[in-house]
Amino acid sequence: MVEYPYRTSYTKRRIVLILKVLPFFLLIIAALVGISQLQVVREFFGQASGEPANIQVDTQAVLGPMPRPWRNLAQGGEEHDWRMGKLVPSVRALNPEYIRIDHIYDFYEIVQGTPGNITFDFSKFDGVLDDIVASGAKPYIALSYMPPAISSGDILAVPVNWADWQLTVQKTIEHVSGTRGISDVYYEVWNEPDLFGDWKYYGDKNYITLYDYAQRGAKNARGVRPFKIGGPGITALYKNWFDALLKYAVANNARLDFFSWHRYNLDLDIYRKDMFEANNWLTQFPQLEPTLELHITEWGHDSNNHPGYDTNYGAAHAVAGSIEMIGVVDRAFAFEIQDGKDPEGKANWGRWGMFTHNDFGAAPKPRYSALRMLDRIGDQRLQLLGKGTWVKAAAARNDAGNTQVILSNFDRSGRNTENVPVTFKNIQPGNYSVVKEFLGGRKQTENVSTSAAELQVHVAMPANTVSLIELIPQ
């Protein structure tokens, strides 16, 4: 057989070329296959890179009173005749400080008549106020939407004349903060103006105009107890809205007591980030910085219906998010109290409520039970270190002098399980009972002894669970 050297050389060159190109082909194939699995890959690496919790509580390091930003609730516009009714005792058990209500002008028929000739009837709205007061809370009222009697179109339109809107706000404040005699009510001008009505902070449909006439009405209110007015309750924290409203307030000596926004997000760090940014922006307005309050007037893990609102997923997010707000957020309003009715007739349909619709027994969901558990934490906040990526925790001393730790393991993928070490430091040597209570009612008690000044226990925390631990001297 005759050999041809040029063929051998050519074959070698082809092999070398193939070996050089092969990695690029493999990379392209991997990319094509990987696109559909991108989220899985991200979650895998996120899971691998997360930090497990190693909780350490200094039982003698009291930081001060325990802040409770979670003691604020909101109810959306589910039904025109919604009342808390038989839910009042259950809501009262959450110890709410404020309950936010919107749709007051299009649901409760407060404004009647025609443009330029209007009257007011608060009788239907009074029932809602009665429920709020009976729950132990004060009203936080979103002044929304445009009363049909004065609107130039639908409930999201501008009024026929702005004087009617100004008078409407004035009379609302005079009724709630005057006739009803309720002190320290918050009035929030509109609800999500960037979504409901497509308001801007400039142009023909200008939220600044809406706010201006509202605060004029507030200034004209007579015979009233102390109250606060602000807004805008936008869908998220936006610097352009923040700057526009504060610049207007400073330039016009307008009353602006608080700035508000909503935040629906799975990122537990977002609330801290929001507050850091807002406080940083606020430094540019020294006239307002000493007094302006910052509120999150709706929050949850998803602004749309989501099955997690019916399960421990939403419960773990609510507690973990609340823990991350401690000492950072003054008021955050969990949305919402009760479900509306599912058009398909389901009891659980991923709605935001802590209770099902009345037609399904107004049954409490896990998020309600979790917030009740969270609120059992003691009043003296203790130093706690060692929170992880998924497991968040807070510690306090209760009235009995016992140390408590609330734990929440929120994992959006539902996979993270930890056997969380909890170390109690600066304790007296001796005998203790460790009571572990879990969302759903399961309870464990361990009797332990230590000759040292610290004690470590472990808490098994599957994904999306909440537990309350109490260390009791014997």
Where on the chain are the PLM-derived regions?
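N-terminal carbohydrate-binding accessory modules
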Residues: 38-98
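Hydrophobic membrane-insertion alpha-helices, especially the h-region
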Residues: 20-34
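Carbohydrate-binding surface patches
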Residues: 388-430, 464-470
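Glycoside hydrolase catalytic-domain groove-lining segments
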Residues: 263-307, 330
